[in-house]
Structure formats: C-alpha cells, structure tokens
Design a protein with these regions (language model features):
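N-terminal metal-binding scaffold of metallo-dependent hydrolase/deaminase domains
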Residues: 1-43
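Divalent metal-coordination and catalytic microenvironments
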Residues: 7, 23, 28, 54, ...
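Short beta->alpha connector loops
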Residues: 9, 121-128, 182-183, 244-248
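Short, glycine/acidic-enriched loop or turn micro-motifs at the edges of active sites
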Residues: 66-68, 126, 209, 246
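Alpha-helical scaffold segments that flank or form the walls of functional sites
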Residues: 74-139, 159-168
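Short, surface-exposed connector motifs at secondary-structure boundaries
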Residues: 111-119, 170-175, 232-238, 256-261
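Metal-coordinating catalytic core of metallo-dependent amide/deamination hydrolases
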Residues: 130-245
C-alpha cells in the first residue's frame, strides 16, 4: 500500500471543505481519504510513504477532447480556415504516420498532460491499439473515441475495437464515434447508428465547428449537421458533440432532447 500524508485535501464534494488529512492507495485504487490516522497507519506495512508537506491533493483534471498524437503538428500551420487547415496541412501529414509513430507521440502528449495535472482524457485518433497501449504503459486513464470517416478506419473496425476495448473498469476504454459529418458519407453514418442501437452505446463526433461546415451540410441535406445526424438516429443513446460553435436554436433543442454533452 501507498500512504500520502501531511496533505491538504480537496475532494470537490460540495459539503466538504479543504481539510488536513491523508490518502491510502492499494491495488491502484484509493482505499481511504480522511483525517490523518497515525494509530492505524503504524499497523500497516507500507510499500511507500510520501510526505505531501502541506501541499494540496485534489482530483486530476480531465481533458474531454484530445487528438494526442497531433502534438507533432503543433504550430505547423496557424491562422487558417478549418477546412483548408485540415485538407492542406493536417490530413496529408497524418497519412504518413505509422502506428509506432502514434504510440510514441501519444506518450509525449501524456507527459505534457501529467505536468499540467491532467490525469484522464477522451482521445480521438487513428490507431486505437497503439493509443491504448501508450496510455496503459504510462498509467494514464484514456477513453479512445472512434474516428471513422471516408478515408480511414471502417464501421467493422470500429465494432471490433468496441468489442475488444469497451469496458467499465481499468485505465482504458473505447466508445463509438466518427470524425465529422462533413468527412463521413451517409452509408458510414448509418452503420455507426446501427452499432449504437446494437450496443445501446453513445456516439461522439465533431460538430458545427465552422460556418462553412454548417452551410455546406444545409446545401447537401437541407438540414444543419446536428439535425441531420438526429434524423439518422445517431443520438438515440446520447453521446457528445465537440466544438458546436455555430448552433441554431433547433440544434440546441436536439442537444437537450437527447441529453448530449
């Protein structure tokens, strides 16, 4: 067991103020959080004891939307319209990445997360196997999100990853998702919708990030991306939409109706 003592503890519970105390950890799970208990502590053989020296201990921050391995593209191209940035400066470089590249780049990003107090993320990228391996090797908590679109991954691969990695315990898990409406043809979206119904699973995706994205979807389908995705049954079990910069009142009603985060 591990003991962290002489700490100021913030639990984030509304009815509990910051207090002086200690934390006991066994088998990677917190067993005790409370006032210092020196009498009981002397009865235990500790693997490690850490004097927090009065510093604050609190739950780690959670980064709800990441593309960890994209750290290699930081400042590669700034101040560009979204679609030009993606098509000209992101997708061509991503196409050259190997699974090993993504493994090591994910570990690099995780090191940066940890230095900022981030202990968990929801990570959408290209190779779930190596992403999950990187997180487990770092002892970092990650939910990998499906990223299928017209040119990478497939509905069958998403289902295989879901069956392999989706679980309620452990450091890592997997959830259904796709990159975005504008990169994913209707046939694939319908396939993901069917998986959601089969597994009673939520779906996660980028949505309404730019005005041009919304306008192009309206031109193609007669609906905004949010309404179009609802029509395809993608929100029957909720989920999450990333960005949502350009949303109509009708879009917001969809979000409320399906309790989408």
């Amino acid at each position: 067991m591990i003991r962290i003592y002489h700490a100021r503890i913030l639990t984030m519970q509304e009815d509990q103020e910051i207090f002086d105390g200690e934390i006991w950890i066994s088998d990677q799970k917190i067993q005790y959080v409370g006032p210092e208990n020196k009498e009981e502590a002397t009865k235990i053989t500790w693997e490690r004891q850490i004097d927090a020296k009065g510093n604050l201990i609190m739950p780690g921050f959670k980064n709800a939307h990441t593309h960890s391995a994209m750290t290699f593209l930081r400042s590669h191209a700034d101040d560009m319209p979204l679609l030009s940035w993606l098509n000209d400066q992101v997708f061509p470089y991503e196409a050259k990445l190997t699974p090993d590249d993504i493994y090591y780049l994910s570990k690099l990003a995780i090191m940066e997360y940890l230095t900022s107090g981030i202990t968990a993320n929801a990570d959408m990228y290209l190779t779930p196997d190596t992403m999950i391996q990187a997180s487990e090797d770092c002892g970092f908590r990650t939910t990998v999100i499906g990223a299928v679109n017209d040119f990478t991954q497939s509905v069958k691969e998403v289902e295989n990853w879901y069956e392999k990695y989706h679980k309620e315990d452990g450091l890592t898990s997997y959830e259904l998702g796709f990159h975005a409406e504008y990169t994913t043809k209707r046939e694939i979206l319908e396939g993901i919708s069917e998986l959601s119904k089969k597994y009673h699973a939520p779906i996660y995706t980028h949505n309404s990030e730019s005005a041009s994205e919304v306008a192009q979807c309206v031109e193609r389908t007669g609906m905004t991306p949010t309404v179009y995705m609802e029509q395809l049954g993608l929100f029957e079990y909720g989920g999450g939409l990333y960005h949502c910069v350009h949303m109509s009142e009708e879009d917001l009603d969809v979000v409320k109706r399906h309790q989408i985060s």
